[in-house]
Structures are given as structure tokens and as C-alpha cells.
Amino acid sequence: MKQLFATTSRGFEELLKVELTELGAQEAKVVQGGVHYQADDETLYRTLLWSRLASRILFPLIETKIYSDLDLYAAVSGFNWLAQFDERVTFFVDFNGTNQEIRHTQFGAMRVKDGIVDYFERQGKTRPDVDKIQPDVRIHAYLNRENLVISLDLSGEALHLRGYREDAGQAPLRETLAAAIVMRSGWQVGSPLVDPMCGSGTLLIEAAQIEAKIAPQLYRLHWGFDFWKAHNQSAWEKVKNEAIELAEEKQSEIQPHFYGFDLDHRVLKKAQKNAQNGGVSHLIKWQQADVAALKNPRLNEVGTVICNPPYGERLGTTPALIALYSVFGQRLKKEFCGWNVSVFSSESTLLDCLRMRASRQFKAKNGPLDCVQKNYQVSERKSDAITDEKELEFNRTSEVAPDFANRLQKNIKKISKWAKQQELDAYRLYDADLPEYNLAVDRYADYIVVQEYAAPKNIDENKARQRLLDAVTATLQVTGVETNKLILKVRQKQKGTNQYEKLANKGEYFYVNEYGAQLWVNLTDYLDTGLFLDHRLTRKMIGELAKGKDFLNLFAYTGSATVHAALGGAKSTTTVDMSNTYLNWAEQNLILNDIEGKQHKLIQADCLQWLEKCDRQFDLIFVDPPTFSNSKRMEESWDVQRDHVKLMSNLKRVLSNNGTIVFSNNKRGFKMNLVALEELGLSAIEISHKTLPLDFERNKQIHNCWMIQHI
């Protein structure tokens, strides 16, 4: 009996133990990352040929403790390698693990290689060559602290390489992972299996090979034992011939009941080719189809729906996936009553969009991603969610977040008509109207931006996430916007300058119209879009006040107020902001509106420091500072409540005799220190109600705005 070790992906060890035991393995023992077992020659070859879950099968040669690279070299060079293979073979060393002495796997692999070739030279033999591409012999070294295990890799290439997959779509599953998903899905051999988003077909091919009794390595041409001196050719031929006979025997017994659907006809061609290579093309029916129109191909039977849908690593990039999972859940409940469903995803949040309760779930890794597989039982009663294809859109809306959907629909009717009259492309459609749906929905021309407000700490995180998913689904249905034109953002309470935090780097800009001004927006790269919609009337008012005046825009952001002032006939404009990014944005806004000339200055500076040194006067000043800032580029922190009087003192110095300051901020509960202002010789009138547009009338505290002049 040989002592062997089968490696597998983390989480599949128990499943692998069962599989190996069924194949005849003795004394199977689970450890992290694999299973130790004993086997005679026939069982060894049977596990190599038939295991669908093992990544590699290793034959340990050296097990020892090492405390330096010299110990490593000594252990390897002192081993009798001629008993395993001769000098004419090529070899390669896979080295895994590090410790304090051997800190790099490449260094460890080099020392093992040195030990092997030096051993052969000491025996008077030719140095065996290293082959990184297709070596005759593969040596596997594993180091954990001081514990070293060096094994002969009897697999050769990793066992997930079945040989049938010539090509794949994006993010393909490893075949070993696909086999595990099938085994855990609840699918019963002989029953229908449907993959509605099949990609290159790996799940269906693995399942079909299980039913057809096709050994997963039946088509493998090269093995790690081909040049092994202990290789038992007669035992190997017996095991392989048994597998060939069994596969031929089963071919005539199986009727086609595997179905693969995908929207991409190109990837379906790859799936068909892969199935042909895997010997199961006659068992699987392929069809180009959208999951939104998914039909049950076996209405009078009960089977399993299995799939690995697309998934994103960040929720904020996946509105299209939210819609996909939502409609998938609806089709399952309409078309597959009484069926089992098994879905594998890295984002359990997306699985919540199915709106189904899982009966079982399993954790797994897909490369670096933590994933989950959830099994469901579809109710035997046909869902009323979709009763007629013509009513698909309406019923989707009414099933998912109906209260939110109805409110959004009502707001759209009211606000869209008003926005058209005002010649506005960008406006708010929903602003946390319903407490349970704590988010904002904005339209920017053909795009929709959904901004989630951070949920209070007393709200269950999973419940808040589910409501967000439902709201996104309903928004897509009500607005009819294309999924790639819905942008989802998670917004938290502003801390310092996190409105400047970069979220992406797409660089996708387009302009919107606002009272005759054209303004660039970017919906994806930053927390904000480049245009504060609640200040629309403030900007319009500035345009009306600016004619013939010298205008200062302090804390200017993207300079949209400057554009309105210039279009309103300002004699000059000065735009100051600390961010070079936003100042460049402001410049592009000016160019877009044909605003040019030396009278329009753009200044990158700490606004407070610049103001203290400014020696000219302005007739109209717009200042919209952050609520709080502790930017490293500022010498001191800023708090609008604490510091606004000092700001007004400096602004008074640069304000012309008949000039006006328009001062705004977003601090809720802000209290203007009117007494201190009067002592400065300034008077302030609150005009917040006049600057609140129709689409923000429910949120009266979104900003406060003041008009300040000399007494």
C-alpha cells in the first residue's frame, strides 16, 4: 500500500474524502487542503483517473524538518533519486510555502533543483534538464514552518485540466470546482439539468460526464507517472481499459436531458466544442436565450436548475447584475415549480435578489474570491409574479418594492414635466421619501444615479441591503433605463474631504443643460458627480445678479456657479479651489460655454489662505465651504459652525461697498452668528427657502443659504 496525498480547493476536503473512499482508498484522513490516504497500485491509478475533485495526487518521498537552506539542500541531495527516475528525464520543481530562512518560493525551488542535479552528478550521471513547460517528472515541495514534504506529483499537469476545454468565456470555473458544485447541487443522476447562463458549459459537461460514467481524465495523454520507475503499467492499463469499456457501455443508455442557455452565441459555440471534446455533445442541448425569457424545457418533469451567474466584486458596480438576478428569480418561480435550484456566486447580496429562501448553503473559493453556493426548492405553486409576457414590466414593478415603485412613478410624472418646462437635464426624482428606502434617485439626461444613504446603526445590515437591491430593481423597471446607464453609489456622512475621494477611473464625462448653461458631469469616478443639484436655483440667482460685476467663487468645486455668473454678464470671474482636478473641470466647463479671456481667472490654492492674502475687491461673492475639513493640504482644520465668523471677517475686507455675499453650507442645524456679523458691520438675510427647487422641496435642510451685505 502506498501513502498518498490528494490536494483540493479549501472547503472540498470532506467531499474529496467520500469520493476517494468510493474509489477504494483506505485510511482516508482529511487535513486542510487535502486528504491523506492509502492505496494499492490499481486504486492509485483509479483515483488519478476518476477523481473529479482532486487538484493533484502526490506520492511523498521526503518528510523532514529543516532550519536553513543548507538543511533543505542536504535533505534533497541525500535522497536516492535514481530509485524514482533516471537522468534522461526532464523535471520541474513546484515549491510552496516559506519560513524565516527560506523567504521566497523561487529560492526554495532552486535549492531543491540544485540538490537533485547534484545528486545525479555525484552518481556519475548526466545532469537532468529542467523543463518548465511539459516536464517528464514534476517534483512538489511543501514547507510549513520547519516541516518539509517533498513529493512526486503523479498527476503531472493539475487534474482540473480535463483536456476538453479548448476555450472559455470570461471568468470560467475550474473543472474541479464545477464538479463540486454539481455534487452539492442536489441534482440526481437521470433527472433534467438546466443551466440558464451556461457560458462555456463546464457545469453541464461535468454533470453529463458523471452520468455517462466518463472518467474525467480519460482523454489525458501525459501523466506524472510516465517516467516513474515504480509505475505499474499492467495495473494502469487494466484501470484505463475498465474506464473505456464503462464509458462505451453507458453511451447508448442515456437520453439527452441536459440544457444549456446563454445570451452570447459565441460562447455557446465554445461550449458545443468543449462538449464534443468531452464526449458528451449528444447529451446536451444548447440554445441562445435571454434569462429574462427563460422557459422550462421539461415541463412535465422535476429536475435541477444550476448556474454560476456573472457577479461583481463591488456592489456599486453591479446594477445590471441586480436586475439580472431579480428577473432570474422571477423566471424560476414561474417556469420551474417544484424544481431544485443551485446558484454559485461570490456575492451573497446578489443571491438575495432571487427573493428565495435557501435550504442549504456551502462556502467555497473560486480563485481568490470567497464564494457561496445556495440551494433552493421552488414552490410547487406557480408564481403569480408574471402572468403574461405583455405584463412583464408592470408585474415586476408591483412585486418588488411596490411602495417605492409607486412613489417613484408618482414623482416622475410630477417632476419630469416641470424639468422639461425649466429646460433641465439633471434633477432629483426621489429623496428618501419613504423611511424604509433611504436613498436618492437622480436623473442626468439618459442616466439614473441611485445613491444609498448609510443606514442608521440600529437598522439590520442585511435588511438595508435587501431594500437597496429591491429599490434598484424597481428603479430599473419604473424608469425603463438601460442597466448600463444606472449608476449605484453608497453614500455615507461626509467626513473631511471625502467628497473628493476617487472611486473609479473611467473618465466618462458628458454635459447636461441647466438654465442655458452646459455643465460637465462624471457619474462614476467620484462620490459626487460634479454638480450639486440642490444649488440649481442658487446658481441661477448668481447669474441674475452678476451682470457687470466682479465675481468671486470660493470653494468653487467644478465652477458651475462661475459659468452662470459669466453667462449672466459678469465683468470678471475668479474661481478658487484647492483641488487641481476640480479646477481643471471648472476650466472645461468654461470652455464648453465659450467663456474665454484673461478676465476669467482660475486659481488653485487653499481658499482660506488665499483669501487672507487677497488684495482686490469683488462685487459678488459665492462661498459654499465644506461642513468640515482636515485636509493635509490645509494648515488648519475647518468647521463651518466654528469658523464662519472668521470667514466673514475676511470676506468683508474684499467685498465692495455695495457688494453681496451669497453664503451657503450643508450643515444641518447651522446657526448664523448674527450678533458677531453685526459687530463686523455685516447684515445677513436667510434665503434658503428661495433657493430650494421643486425636486428638493421635501428636504428643507439639505442646505442653508444667506445673502450678506455691508450694513
UniProtKB/Swiss-Prot annotation:
Protein EC: 2.1.1.173, 2.1.1.264
Intrachain S-S bonds: none
Chief place of localization: cytoplasm
Alphabetical list of SUPFAM superfamilies matching this protein: S-adenosyl-L-methionine-dependent methyltransferases
Residues in the signal sequence: none
Family, similarity comment: Belongs to the methyltransferase superfamily. RlmKL family.
MF annotations from Gene Ontology: 23S rRNA (guanine(2445)-N(2))-methyltransferase activity; RNA binding; rRNA (guanine-N7-)-methyltransferase activity
The keyword Magnesium is assigned to this record: no
Protein name (database record): Ribosomal RNA large subunit methyltransferase K/L
